[in-house]
Regions:
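A conserved regulatory-domain signal marking ACT and ACT-like small-molecule sensing domains
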Residues: 1-87
Length: 87
């Protein structure tokens, strides 16, 4: 069964950071649906929406947390749901 996760990452910017994160996601057969990245001064921040087998979530989290100087947060989300906001 697939799970949708939103991954946030932040830490000092450096060369190869996106490649390193992407490689780990690929190694764990995660499918990147969308991502946003930004550099603020010397800091890097990234949001990624992925699909991954639900039983691989913890293994992926452990692998990401091995990257030096980056902090990760993984949140399970639901499929695209339309939400109507009233003003």
């Amino acid at each position: 069964m697939l799970s949708k996760l939103i991954i946030s990452a932040n830490g000092p910017d450096r060369k190869g950071i996106v490649s390193e994160i992407s490689s780990i996601l690929d190694e764990h057969n995660a499918n990147i649906e969308t991502s946003k990245m930004i550099r603020l001064e010397k800091e890097f921040a990234m949001l990624i929406l992925i699909d991954i087998q639900i039983d691989k979530t913890k293994i992926l989290e452990d692998a990401l947390n091995k990257i030096d100087d980056l902090f990760f947060n993984l949140i399970e989300t639901k499929s695209n749901q339309n939400i109507l906001y009233k003003n």
